[in-house]
Curated annotation (Swiss-Prot):
SUPFAM superfamilies: delta-Endotoxin (insectocide), middle domain, delta-Endotoxin (insectocide), N-terminal domain, Galactose-binding domain-like. This is Pesticidal crystal protein Cry1Ba. The gene is cry1Ba. GO terms for biological process: sporulation resulting in formation of a cellular spore; symbiont-mediated killing of host cell. It comes from Bacillus thuringiensis subsp. kurstaki. Belongs to the delta endotoxin family. PANTHER family: ENDOTOXIN_N DOMAIN-CONTAINING PROTEIN-RELATED, PESTICIDAL CRYSTAL PROTEIN N-TERMINAL DOMAIN-CONTAINING PROTEIN. GO terms for molecular function: signaling receptor binding; toxin activity. InterPro entries: Cry1Ac-like_dom-VII, Cry_V, Galactose-bd-like_sf, Pest_crys, Pest_crys_Cry1Aa_dom-IV, Pest_crys_dom-III, Pest_crys_dom_I, Pest_crys_N_sf. Residues 423-458 are annotated as: Disordered. The lineage of its organism: Bacteria, Bacillati, Bacillota, Bacilli, Bacillales.
Length: 1228
């Protein structure tokens, strides 16, 4: 340091005539009093070596954090060995003596000798390890050097484990503390080497993991130990007077430099958290000794004995309360003057004002001491400059041997440099007149030396002046300088190739609700705290690199509550997530209560000078959130690849149970496996091809396990409504066994679409649109067969919904379990900065960056209640009692939408075994099963009776059991009456979805098939097509204005005008007899006429008038045996034969009909064992309504002579309403 100082200007002129030693005075007694004390005094031995070593090591470590280059590490270890085990006096002994003198406590001789001997052994071993490491780094392929290094590493690490307790001897913890901290630092650096080089010099992956876990554990333990005993030693020095404060402040400063600064860097040794070069910053402040005369035999000549203020008063005046980091910009010094004689007088520093500014913040001004003096103040400006050294002169003005002297500072030299412009350097001076026996030079570099003597101190300085306090009493005027470490830069510069740690106290301003609190000792400075929602203050950063570089955000926090943490850049939110509490309210802030978290979503800066803001929301209660620092982490290709690989490995391993790596966890969903497979597929082939292949095999195995346990058929939706080849068909009723169908795939409405995977689904998914009529819902269903189920077991249906509205989900066995789900869509998973999530061939680019969102939030809905799910995952469980393969009750899985606004996109459906039923759940399912069986027995008795009545009525319609010829007297009313009895059979179909057959479906379809046959035969016997006008005016010729209207659930022809006419040409069998039967109603005056005729003559007519009595038509009719049932069905037969459609067409709507057609035979509401469902049997001729009052049925016999007759309908006046027209062939 001496050589460096020669490069600076000489001592300022104001004190050039005065020696740093005191001049002799004529009075011998005064001369004696001014002698420097050589015996026991309060001024402890300040070892430049002790402080220098602590500063040097911390400064050097700051340059090799993260993963250093091999050359850097070898040089660093060589430096450490040279600093801690130098030639000459033992540095460890100097550490011991320095702390002993600070606390005035001698360590026992045995403890001293044991510690020093063990440290000497560690030094020898460490030096040997360091030399072997250098040899190996020069030739890593040499097997011998690798083997030697492996052996020495294991032995040296074990030596440290055994040695550390010797530096923590009971009742000797404080004097040994600096030794303990330095030894702990070496141990942690050694443990880091296992992660850096262990795999190369022979450590197995298990050994590396064990050493890493030990490093994490020891980092916590060493940190808490050092902080605890630092506080213990400091508190033991707390006194009541100024003398105790001097010792207290020296301990605080020197052990901050030698202990706490190291502790603050311990976490950054973690190469898994910091895998690249890392920039750390120390923002704590240290205070050099007060600028007052000390070490003089005469008590009053020492400033702290000259009626100085109390301990607490000095602490309040000199030590700053917690605050944001700021930088000194201007100092204005106010002076006072005292005079004893022309040869004894002094003008000295009496007070000052300071202007300082946080990074990018506003100017703050504070006043200290007395400023109401008559002497012109001296203003010194330091904007953008670091004051790296002060040379202050402590003056003592003697008033006589029996009077108290005045202590003051007449001269200070402030040495400054501009860190951004090294040529901008110099001195700023405060110099006032002084005449007295002598001055004491107080050089700040004695207490805060540069980091190295190999460069000028304006380049190698370790600290910068940040603030100045002053201890003021009537005869005491001594400033106290506050210093910050130079690692805390002025610009928050972010590099593209390093992790930049930025303490939160470097914010530009402090928002309301945020407070700065004293750091816990292991953070390297103060921290920020909030107890409510709000921001922590903006941090202005300077980006040193391309703006295309991507970064992530990490941060270190402690909290007594859960909270949402938001990060924004330039006003745009780039990250947010919910984080959990780390401690309980009232807990002490210890190392383990702070955790480091990092976001995975990268972002870019938009300008070189940018702003990062952090805030918290959604606190789970009253509590405290502490933030230590944030980290700006560059996303490099290698770093991203390694991070992605680690994340993929963790995700794949998490698929399987801990006890059996070949067994899939129950709570791992099929959707989750697909997302993990995406994660693996996106790994870089360039960086981790082998690992990628291995992980892909594991995730494929997991997918196979998922498929094996899934009881659903075709869960990937390869097809819907695909009929298996082996399914049998009931020829009699033309009814395919839906029970058999449903156990072999999906069945659904025609409007469902299967779509290929997108950015949400990896595999096929289905889209269910809305419907215009709740009686014709959109539906999808499948049956889990009884043979797939286990008795007394709970099963779970689950899947993933991209979005939905009014989606109803049912699980049906003994009863229906039901939920209605509204799941809001994700809009887009892709941020605006991503151009397109589509690959080159149009496929989804699942590797593109996307917003993070939490799909695992739960939503609880009561059974049957409609709710908005926040989770896109859904699950519904059902309990199975005893199983019966003959009954084959199974479980129906149903998805349904019955609203126009409804919709759903869903996939990855699973039906899996969850767990056996025990306890109350077992009792509950047995009760449900018994209740269901009791109802089933009652239903069977009822069904037997209803079925007998219905079958008798149906059989009466036909000639025999062949069901191919109707009885001669069978008419449409009899058919309708029989059909009504058939529909009294309950549980033919499920009320939840009437296309699914119920327990009585088979007998219902048997009889319903006969009804359909009867109607078909009856239609064939009636040669008039669309005679009931159910298909509007199809097959009829119309002249004038006519209409078909719905009345009493029937379709009626309405002729409102006399000039209108409706007619139809009908093919007949010449020579056979026919009956023309018409049911109609006449309103108003005039007559309604239905005429039948041939081309010439042979005309007959039925006339209708208002208020006529209904005629009873005869049942005995003639026959024409040679006329086939198929004759006369050509032409428009298909369009008119509306009643021949089976139930399977019930959900198809004919959009080509000429009128707004609604089927005539409406279904009445019917109470099922579950609930009413007015849509349940809306499929055919059910409850055919009787002819309303006022309608009249008339008929006549007609014998055509040709093969064509014409039927014409008209009126003379008023309105003529025709319900039906029939021309029936007479039978024998």
């Amino acid at each position: 340091m001496t050589s460096n100082r020669k490069n600076e200007n000489e001592i300022i002129n104001a004190v050039s005539n005065h020696s740093a030693q005191m001049d002799l005075l004529p009075d011998a007694r005064i001369e004696d009093s001014l002698c420097i004390a050589e015996g026991n005094n309060i001024d402890p031995f300040v070892s430049a070596s002790t402080v220098q070593t602590g500063i040097n090591i911390a400064g050097r470590i700051l340059g090799v954090l993260g993963v250093p280059f091999a050359g850097q590490l070898a040089s660093f270890y060589s430096f450490l060995v040279g600093e801690l085990w130098p030639r000459g006096r033992d540095q460890w002994e100097i550490f011991l003596e320095h702390v002993e003198q600070l606390i005035n406590q001698q360590i026992t001789e045995n403890a001293r000798n044991t510690a020093l001997a063990r440290l000497q052994g560690l030094g020898d071993s460490f030096r040997a390890y360091q030399q072997s490491l250098e040899d190996w780094l020069e030739n890593r392929d040499d097997a011998r050097t690798r083997s030697v290094l492996y052996t020495q590493y294991i032995a040296l690490e074990l030596d440290f484990l055994n040695a550390m307790p010797l530096f923590a001897i009971r009742n000797q913890e404080v004097p040994l503390l600096m030794v303990y901290a330095q030894a702990a630092n070496l141990h942690l650096l050694l443990l880091r080497d296992a992660s850096l080089f262990g795999s190369e010099f022979g450590l197995t992956s298990q050994e590396i993991q064990r050493y890493y876990e030990r490093q994490v554990e020891r980092t916590r333990d060493y940190s808490d130990y050092c902080v605890e005993w630092y506080n213990t030693g400091l508190n033991s020095l707390r006194g009541t007077n100024a003398a105790s404060w001097v010792r207290y402040n020296q301990f605080r400063r020197d052990l901050t430099l030698g202990v706490l600064d190291l502790v603050a860097l311990f976490p950054s040794y973690d190469t898994r958290t910091y895998p690249i070069n890392t920039s750390a910053q120390l923002t704590r402040e240290v205070y050099t000794d007060a600028i007052g005369a000390t070490g003089v035999n005469m008590a009053s000549m020492n400033w702290y004995n000259n009626n100085a203020p109390s301990f607490s008063a000095i602490e309040a005046a000199a030590i700053r309360s917690p605050h944001l980091l700021d930088f000194l910009e201007q100092l204005t010094i106010f002076s006072a003057s005292s005079r004893w004689s022309n040869t004894r007088h002094m003008t000295y520093w009496r007070g000052h004002t300071i202007q300082s500014r946080p990074i990018g913040g506003g100017l703050n001004t504070s006043t200290h001491g007395a400023t109401n003096t008559s002497i012109n103040p001296v203003t010194l400006r330091f904007a953008s400059r670091d004051v790296y050294r002060t040379e202050s002169y402590a003056g003592v003005l003697l008033w006589g041997i029996y009077l108290e002297p005045i202590h003051g500072v007449p001269t200070v030299r402030f040495n400054f440099t501009n860190p951004q412009n090294i040529s901008d350097r110099g001195t700023a001076n405060y110099s006032q007149p002084y005449e007295s026996p002598g001055l004491q030079l107080k050089d700040s570099e004695t207490e805060l030396p540069p980091e190295t003597t190999e460069r000028p101190n304006y380049e190698s300085y370790s600290h910068r002046l940040s603030h100045i306090g002053i201890i003021l009493q009537s005869r005491v005027n001594v400033p106290v300088y506050s210093w910050t470490h130079r690692s805390a830069d002025r610009t928050n510069t972010i590099g593209p190739n390093r992790i930049t740690q930025i303490p939160m106290v470097k914010a530009s301003e402090l928002p309301q609700g945020t407070t700065v609190v004293r750091g816990p000792g292991f953070t390297g400075g103060d921290i920020l705290r909030r107890t409510n929602t709000g921001g922590f203050g903006p941090i202005r950063v300077t980006v040193n690199g391309p703006l295309t570089q991507r970064y992530r955000i990490g941060f270190r926090y402690a909290s007594t509550v859960d909270f949402d943490f938001f990060v924004s850049r330039g006003g745009t939110t780039v990250n947010n997530f919910r984080f959990l509490r780390t401690m309980n309210s009232g807990d002490e802030l210890k190392y383990g209560n702070f955790v480091r978290r990092a976001f995975t979503t990268p972002f870019t800066f938009t300008q070189i000078q940018d702003i990062i803001r952090t805030s918290i929301q959604g606190l789970s209660g009253n509590g405290e959130v502490y933030i230590d620092k944030i980290e700006i982490i560059p996303v490099t290709a290698t770093f991203e690849a390694e991070y992605d690989l680690e994340r993929a490995q963790e995700a794949v391993n998490a698929l399987f149970t801990n006890t059996n790596p070949r067994r899939l966890k129950t709570d791992v969903t099929d959707y989750h496996i697909d997302q993990v497979s995406n994660l693996v597929a996106c790994l870089s082939d360039e960086f981790c091809l082998d690992e990628k292949r291995e992980l892909l095999e594991k995730v494929k195995y997991a997918k196979r396990l998922s498929d094996e346990r899934n009881l659903l058929q075709d869960p990937n939706f390869t097809s819907i409504n695909k009929q298996p080849d082996f399914i049998s068909t009931n020829e009699q009723s033309n009814f395919t066994s839906i029970h058999e169908q449903s156990e072999h795939g999906w069945w659904g409405s025609e409007n469902i679409t299967i779509q290929e995977g997108n950015d949400v689904f990896k595999e096929n998914y289905v889209t269910l649109p809305g419907t215009f009529n709740e009686c014709y819902p959109t539906y999808l269903y499948q049956k889990i067969g009884e043979s797939e189920l286990k008795a007394y077991t709970r099963y779970q249906l689950r899947g993933y919904i991209e979005d939905s509205q009014d989606l109803e989900i049912y699980l049906i066995r003994y009863n229906a379990k039901h939920e209605t789900l509204d799941v809001p869509g994700t809009e887009s998973l892709w941020p605006l900065s991503v151009e397109s999530p589509i690959g080159r061939c149009g496929e989804p680019n699942r590797c593109a960056p996307h917003f993070e969102w939490n799909p695992d939030l739960d939503c609880s809905c009561r059974d049957g209640e409609k709710c908005a799910h926040h989770s896109h995952h859904f699950s519904l469980d059902i309990d199975v009692g005893c199983t019966d393969l003959h009954e084959n009750l199974g479980v129906w899985v149903v998805f349904k939408i019955k609203t126009q606004e409804g919709h759903a996109r869903l996939g990855n459906l699973e039906f899996i075994e969850e767990k056996p039923l025990l306890g109350e759940a077992l009792s509950r399912v047995k009760r449900a099963e018994k209740k269901w069986r009791d109802k089933r027995e009652k239903l069977q008795l009822e069904t037997k009776r209803v079925y007998t009545e219905a079958k008798e009525a149906v059989d009466a319609l036909f000639v025999d059991s062949q069901y191919d010829r109707l009885q001669a007297d069978t008419n449409i009313g009899m058919i309708h009456a029989a059909d009504k009895l058939v529909h009294r059979i309950r549980e033919a179909y499920l009320s939840e979805l009437p296309v699914i057959p119920g327990v009585n479906a088979e007998i219902f379809e048997e009889l319903e098939g006969h009804i359909i046959t009867a109607i078909s035969l009856y239609d064939a016997r009636n040669v008039v097509k669309n005679g009931d006008f159910n298909n509007g005016l199809t097959c009829w010729n119309v002249k004038g204005h006519v209409d078909v209207q719905q009345s009493h659930h029937r379709s009626d022809l309405v002729i409102p005008e006399w000039e209108a006419e409706v007619s139809q040409a009908v093919r007949v069998c010449p020579g056979c007899g026919y009956i023309l039967r018409v049911t109609a109603y006449k309103e108003g005056y005039g007559e309604g006429c239905v005429t039948i005729h041939e081309i010439e003559n042979n005309t007959d007519e039925l006339k209708f008038k208002n208020r006529e009595e209904e005629e009873v038509y005869p049942t005995d009719t003639g026959t024409c045996n040679d006329y086939t049932a198929h004759q006369g069905t050509a032409g428009c037969a298909d369009a008119c034969n509306s009643r021949n459609a089976g139930y399977e067409d019930a959900y198809e709507v004919d959009t080509t009909a000429s009128v707004n057609y609604k089927p005539t035979y409406e279904e009445e509401t019917y109470t099922d064992v579950r609930r009413d469902n007015h849509c349940e049997y809306d499929r055919g001729y059910v409850n055919y309504p009787p002819v309303p009052a006022g309608y009249v049925t008339k008929e006549l016999e007609y014998f055509p002579e040709t093969d064509t007759v014409w039927i014409e309908i008209g009126e003379t006046e008023g309105k003529f309403i025709v319900d039906s027209v029939e021309l029936l062939l007479m039978e024998e």
